[in-house]
């Protein structure tokens, strides 16, 4: 019975949440994807640079 009360309470709280509208959600999604792509490229270049540096030191 406690689990049923828990889920009812969760439902009540979820109705109180202020969910983003369509344009706002799209803007947030684009921001997140752009940030992820930036960091993927950044760390790939950093990894390549460090690998090349280590290769030069070892040789």
Curated annotation (Swiss-Prot):
One of its GO terms (molecular function) is protein transmembrane transporter activity. It is a single-pass membrane protein. Keywords: Cell membrane, Membrane, Protein transport, Translocation, Transmembrane, Transmembrane helix, Transport. Coiled coil: none annotated. One of its GO terms (biological process) is intracellular protein transmembrane transport. It is found in: Cell membrane. GO terms for cellular component: plasma membrane. It comes from the Bacteria. The chain crosses the membrane at residues 30-50. Essential subunit of the Sec protein translocation channel SecYEG. Clamps together the 2 halves of SecY. May contact the channel plug during translocation. NCBIfam families: secE_bact. HAMAP family: SecE. Component of the Sec protein translocase complex. Heterotrimer consisting of SecY, SecE and SecG subunits. The heterotrimers can form oligomers, although 1 heterotrimer is thought to be able to translocate proteins. Interacts with the ribosome. Interacts with SecDF, and other proteins may be involved. Interacts with SecA. Belongs to the SecE/SEC61-gamma family. This is Protein translocase subunit SecE.
């Amino acid at each position: 019975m406690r689990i049923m009360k828990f889920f009812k309470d969760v439902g009540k709280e979820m109705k109180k949440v202020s969910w983003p509208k369509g344009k706002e959600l799209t803007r947030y999604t684009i921001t997140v994807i752009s940030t992820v792509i930036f960091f993927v490229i950044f760390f790939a270049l950093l990894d390549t640079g460090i690998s090349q540096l280590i290769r030069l030191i070892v040789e």
